[in-house]
């Protein structure tokens, strides 16, 4: 069975249990979905009927006799647990050199280089929450024009500045310069992120003018193959940034998860031939890193509420794929991602019923299935499930 269109949703960080090598990453016992849903008193009827509860025992999501989707869990072959590594593997790359994280801030030589190339002083230079760092340094930045440089548990370098002090175009230009400089392999920083904010001391707000400057993928992805074959590749949310535009034919920005679902529904109702690819980042950015279990739980419920609308809007020859890129268990110590299996659900109105697919294959099985469906070159690793979808 083949499909005219494939819609791929990455529920960012919604892992489904510790990976076989979780202990090496300090993540033994992690289980984002299970731990997030413990104590939840609502229901998730759409994820349940697709078969999410058939993948692993979960609170409130029951196992069903006739799941509507094909389902399994996938493990990551690459040596990281960050967003870029997970997404790049989904599209067929095996990342064997991990991106670097900077738990003690960036090296002095890099800070000096940023100051010299921008003519502005760097302050902060430490891991921090984006909202906390502007609360701490925002007023200082307004007075001095310094750059608030910070990182997180991810391999990112973020630069925050007030929009009225450093205009957006200048902030973007600064980030482009830093991106170019940090392409040196000794840094291995996945993304440089512009983080503009507005407001007054005590009431700062980050704006939607964030921009990510990623490294280009380390090889060709399934998205490149689709683009070369004349197919549409519609990137929704931060997908375009994650792949640095490689293989993307159209990019649609989003404000949050619900706006992402709105934009996906618009795409589903439009005419195109190929892949739509949505990342829902709020699970990770707003709730996982902040260890906000209740917020995470409510975000999953909000997604399930919208999922019913999406299922109804799908065309007969559409395939919907729902997965994740890593875990971020809000009950674990620290603020970092967790090394976990990710769920895989594949649904089409053409299916009489779903069933379990072979488990323990890699994230690249998703890209392989998409490539197989559209008749383009398959990635070097990853198992296509296309023949099993009937």
Swiss-Prot record:
Binds 2 manganese ions. Mn(2+) 1 binds at residues 12, 325-326. Its main location: cytoplasm. It is found in: Cytoplasm. NCBIfam families: deoB, PRK05362.1. Belongs to the phosphopentomutase family. This is Phosphopentomutase. It comes from Macrococcus caseolyticus (strain JCSC5402).
């Amino acid at each position: 069975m083949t499909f005219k269109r494939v819609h791929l949703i990455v529920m960012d960080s919604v892992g489904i249990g510790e990976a076989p090598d979780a202990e090496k990453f300090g993540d033994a016992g992690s289980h984002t979905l299970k731990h997030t849903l413990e104590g939840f008193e609502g229901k998730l009827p759409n994820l349940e009927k697709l078969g999410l509860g058939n993948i692993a025992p979960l609170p409130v999501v029951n196992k069903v006799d006739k799941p509507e989707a094909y389902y399994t869990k996938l493990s990551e072959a690459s040596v990281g647990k960050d967003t870029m590594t997970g997404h790049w593997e989904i599209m067929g790359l095996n990342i064997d050199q991990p991106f670097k994280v900077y738990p003690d801030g960036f090296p002095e030589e890099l800070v000096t280089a940023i100051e010299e190339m921008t003519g502005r002083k760097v302050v902060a230079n430490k891991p921090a929450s984006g909202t906390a760092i502007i609360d701490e340094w925002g007023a200082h930045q307004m007075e001095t024009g310094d750059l608030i440089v910070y990182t997180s548990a991810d391999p990112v370098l973020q630069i925050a500045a007030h929009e009225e002090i450093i205009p957006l175009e200048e902030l973007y230009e600064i980030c482009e310069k830093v991106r170019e400089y940090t392409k040196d392999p000794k840094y291995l920083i996945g993304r440089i992120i512009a983080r503009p904010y507005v407001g007054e001391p005590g009431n700062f707000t980050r704006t939607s003018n964030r921009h990510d400057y990623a490294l280009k993928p380390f090889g060709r992805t399934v998205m490149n193959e689709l683009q070369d074959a004349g197919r549409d590749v519609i990137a929704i949310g931060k997908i375009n940034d994650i792949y640095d535009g490689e293989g993307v034919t159209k990019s649609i920005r989003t404000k949050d998860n619900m706006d992402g679902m709105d934009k996906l529904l618009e795409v589903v109702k439009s005419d195109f031939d190929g892949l739509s690819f949505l990342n829902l980042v709020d699970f990770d950015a707003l709730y996982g890193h902040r260890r906000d279990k209740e917020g995470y739980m409510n975000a999953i419920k909000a997604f399930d509420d919208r999922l019913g609308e999406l299922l109804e809007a799908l065309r007969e020859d559409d395939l919907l794929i729902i997965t994740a890129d890593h875990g971020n268990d809000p009950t674990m110590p620290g603020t970092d991602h967790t090394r976990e299996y990710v769920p895989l659900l594949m649904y089409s109105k053409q299916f009489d019923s779903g069933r379990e697919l072979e488990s323990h294959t890699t994230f690249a099985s998703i890209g392989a299935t998409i490539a197989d469906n559209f008749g383009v070159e398959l990635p070097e690793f990853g198992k296509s499930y296309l023949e099993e979808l009937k």
